[in-house]
């Protein structure tokens, strides 16, 4: 089976949203009920990724080694700075002085195995310093992140504002994210 990763296009939107819906179902079935609530990620968010040239789709072949153009995954791969990464709590980044890329909104169909590996291969072929975060309840993503050699660095909060406000919102379990970083040498 072969895959290609390419920049997402506006004409991909319906397929991307189907992948997002499938990913949400996987999350809910695995006990992750608080991440990616109703309406997120929206077409507006995906369009913003595309406008930054940071929205990507994963296409898979049809089993006969012919690319079918079937979109089986989506992710955002964006250059620093990431505003929510400016403050990290209960830890620190491996390095906070070098530019990095961030990976957000990884989604795939449940029967498309190895998507995370394909995405990481793509990302590390473009940059050597990558950060990623996920919800505390997203055990599947945490497993994949650690399996691919990322280091847990601490906690970040999605909303801006002072730390006390962020921490009180986080007690509801919706804004807190576990943050990871991996650096490789070329």
Predicted regions and their residues:
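Conserved acetyl-CoA-binding loop-helix of GNAT-fold acetyltransferases
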Residues: 108-125, 142-147
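Conserved GNAT-fold acetyl-CoA-binding loop/helix
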Residues: 24-44
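A short beta-loop-alpha structural element at the N-terminal edge
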Residues: 4-18
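Conserved catalytic-core motifs of GNAT/GCN5-like acyltransferases
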Residues: 133, 151-177
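Conserved active-site alpha-helix within GNAT-family acetyltransferase domains
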Residues: 136-155
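Conserved beta-hairpin
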Residues: 52-75
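Conserved acyl-donor/pantetheine-binding loop and adjacent beta-alpha core of acyl/acetyltransferases
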Residues: 76-111
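Conserved GNAT acetyl-CoA-binding A-motif
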Residues: 126-137
């Amino acid at each position: 089976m072969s895959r290609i990763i390419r920049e997402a296009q506006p004409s991909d939107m319906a397929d991307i949203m189907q992948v997002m819906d499938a990913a949400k179902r996987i999350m809910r079935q695995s006990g992750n009920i608080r991440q990616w609530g109703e309406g997120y990620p929206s077409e507006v968010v995906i369009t913003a990724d595309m406008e930054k040239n940071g929205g990507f789709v994963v296409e898979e072949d049809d089993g006969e080694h012919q690319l079918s153009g079937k979109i089986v995954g989506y992710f955002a791969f964006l250059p620093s700075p990431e505003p929510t990464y400016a403050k990290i709590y209960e830890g620190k980044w491996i390095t906070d002085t070098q530019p990095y890329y961030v990976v957000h909104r990884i989604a795939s169909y449940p029967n498309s195995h190895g998507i995370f590996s394909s995405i990481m291969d793509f990302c590390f072929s473009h940059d050597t310093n990558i950060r990623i975060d996920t919800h505390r309840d997203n055990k599947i993503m945490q497993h994949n992140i650690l399996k691919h050699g990322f280091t847990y660095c601490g906690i970040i909060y999605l909303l801006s504002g002072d730390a006390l406000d962020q921490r009180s919102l986080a007690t509801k379990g919706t804004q807190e994210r576990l943050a990871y970083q991996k650096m490789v040498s070329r």
